[in-house]
Amino acid sequence: MANVVVVGAQWGDEGKGKIVDWLSERADVIARFQGGHNAGHTLVIGNQVFKLSLLPSGIVRKGKMAVIGNGVVLDPWSLFAEIDKLSAQGVEISPANLMIAENTPLILPLHQDLDKLREEAAGASKIGTTGRGIGPAYEDKVGRRTIRVADLGDEETLDSRLDRLLAHHDALRQGLGAAPIDRAELRAKLLEIAPKLLQYAQPVWKVMNDYRKAGKRILFEGAQGSLLDIDFGTYPYVTSSTTMSGMAASGTGLGPSAIGFVLGIVKAYTTRVGEGPFPTELDDADGQRLGERGHEFGTVTGRKRRCGWFDAVLVRQTCAISGVDGIALTKLDVLDGFQTLKICTGYEVDGQHYDHLPTAASLQAKAKPVYEEMEGWQESTQGARSWADLPANAIKYVRRIEELIQCPVALLSTSPERDDTILVTDPFAD
């Protein structure tokens, strides 16, 4: 059986949580490999709704091992709050079903402070971060001054790390008009949580390789979306990690050959949270309708999402970069009742045609979508579980998307319920 990597192929919020949950029933191990608690998943299982932002989606299923890899930045206090919330909903979480890489960097309160201070100082030029310290935590990782999970096990090491970290942050805070960090208070907080966090710590790279050798089925769960990738996203309006499929290997300690099937999650229209270019954005009644019908509010921030028509150019681009083998098309039911649907097939920039999104921010800002119109459908697709349940025009819409993005549909989702899914290609099959 192939291991499967799940990545968002747009700006996030594509419905990865449901798809990962649907796939996790057949996986043995579900691993997060990048990001932090800045992206949320909403899972609907029976009559229960679970909202996750850091824990892998598979944590809600019994008999699965949930893994937080070294590519993640971990806020321990948010982790414990999420564990407590799920425990109150009847989910059992212990070292028997949750493992955290020893070399995972920690998000500390000072990272969140810096995130907010910078956004306030930027004013109208702000990036639109969630303010949860993700970016500053990754900066410290690359700057070789981060505190990692394993550092909590030795006070001498922790003190050395704190000295280096605070020398940097106090200088930044002074420039932003903020008071120095209370070292004693931060140290006490870290020592307080150390035993609780260290119980989950493991050499994830070794355990994952052992799982692979034993033939365990591994599901790699990406966060955010490919268009928020630090290298290939709409820079600088991006996240601070690599969101493409290749990160599944380096973010857990498995080699690239461990990746079998890459599944890109794609919404049947387009949404975005925060600032940045969005060529197909709709500021009219159609955009309002998409937002209302799709319940487009962020799981983590509660912010209203910007909505627009499906952008085949962007999805083709991200599928190529991540090596997507098949997509899971979600929220098709949101398009029920539209008389006419539009798909972006290219851009016009200063009279020149583009079949991809240009890298230069100045060109991205001027990109005008070139649309292809398709006839909509009035019948309901909600809850469809086979092609026979879909209106003819809905099938035409799906097939046209496949042609334009040059990638087949492997799964089709027609409601938040996990079983309302049409399987075309089994991602776990060799």
From Swiss-Prot:
Q: What is this protein called?
A: Adenylosuccinate synthetase
Reaction(s) catalysed (UniProt annotation)? IMP + L-aspartate + GTP = N(6)-(1,2-dicarboxyethyl)-AMP + GDP + phosphate + 2 H(+)
User: Where in the sequence is the signal peptide annotated?
Assistant: none
Provide the species name.
Paracoccus denitrificans (strain Pd 1222)
Assembly description: Homodimer.
* Cofactor binding, per record: Binds 1 Mg(2+) ion per subunit.
Give the EC class as a word: ligase
Give the matching SUPFAM superfamilies: P-loop containing nucleoside triphosphate hydrolases
In this chain, GTP is annotated as bound at: 12-18, 40-42, 305, 331-333, 413-415
Positions bound to IMP: D13, E14, G15, K16, N38, A39, G40, H41, T130, R144, Q224, T239, R303
